[in-house]
C-alpha cells in the first residue's frame, strides 16, 4: 500500500451483505463474500476490467456495481459453467453461482431432501456421524471419555 491514502479511500466496503476490508488487495478482499473464492474473484475482476493490483478501498462505485452484477449473473458475462458452484441443480437443472444466504439455504434444503428420502448420506447427517466414508471407531468421539478402571 502506498504511503499516501487517496481521498476517496473506503476502509470498509459493503458488498452483498458482507463487510469487505478496504486495505486488502481487491482479489483477496472479495473472498470475504461467502461463495466467492480466489479463482472466482479473479475471473470476476477480469470480466469487470478492475485492476487486480489495487486495494479494495480504491475501487469506484461503478466498478463495485459492475462486480456485483457479474457475481450475481455470471452466465450473462460468459463465465464457463464448470466455474460455478452449483452445477445441474436437482430442481431445475440449471447452473448457478450461489453466494451468502442463498448458499446456506440451498445447502440446508439439500440436507433436508437427503434426510427426507432416507438416503445413506441423509441418515448419517441425521445421526451426526461422518458422511464421506471415514473410520469412526476411534476418532470423532464426543461426550464423556470412558477410561479403563485400574485393578487393585
Swiss-Prot record:
GO terms for biological process, alphabetical: cytoplasmic translation
A molecular function GO annotation: structural constituent of ribosome
A Pfam family the protein falls into: Ribosomal_S13
Lineage: superkingdom: Eukaryota
Alphabetic keyword roster: Cytoplasm, Phosphoprotein, Ribonucleoprotein, Ribosomal protein, RNA-binding, rRNA-binding
Cellular component annotations (GO), alphabetically ordered: cytoplasm; cytosol; cytosolic ribosome; cytosolic small ribosomal subunit; nucleolus; small ribosomal subunit
InterPro entries: Rbsml_uS13_C, Ribosomal_uS13, Ribosomal_uS13-like_H2TH, Ribosomal_uS13_CS
Principal place of residence: cytoplasm
Post-translational modification Phosphoserine, affected residues: 41
Keyword Phosphoprotein in record: yes
Subcellular location, record wording: Cytoplasm
Family, similarity comment: Belongs to the universal ribosomal protein uS13 family.
Task performed by this protein: Located at the top of the head of the 40S subunit, it contacts several helices of the 18S rRNA.
HAMAP family (UniProt xref): Ribosomal_uS13
Protein's name in the database: Small ribosomal subunit protein uS13
Lineage: Eukaryota, Metazoa, Ecdysozoa, Arthropoda, Hexapoda
